[in-house]
Amino acid sequence: MNSEQLTEILKAAFPDAEVAVSGQAGKFDLRIVDNQFEGKRPVPRQQAVYAPLNSYIASGEVHAVTIRAMTKEEWRKASMFGA
């Protein structure tokens, strides 16, 4: 699994999202910016991101992920302050 493949999987699961993936060797940093996260706490957001990845995690193709799942407004604010 490479970052391009993972990006495509996440874009299919979150078609309206801005998706950014970096990493290699099974360890990836994920940023998914989508307003469907509005009103959701961090754990449900992470669960939504893990859902399309579970089979890849179970098979070992994806070993570890760091997830940043946020709304467009949260991303705008984070970008302004260098987060």
Curated annotation (Swiss-Prot):
Pfam families listed in its UniProt record: BolA (PF01722)
Residue ranges the record marks as coiled coil: none
Highest taxon listed in the record's lineage: Bacteria
Transmembrane segments: none
Disulfide bridges in this chain: none
The family this protein is said to belong to: Belongs to the BolA/IbaG family.
Name the record gives this protein: Uncharacterized protein in rpoN-murA intergenic region
Organism lineage: Bacteria, Pseudomonadati, Pseudomonadota, Gammaproteobacteria, Moraxellales
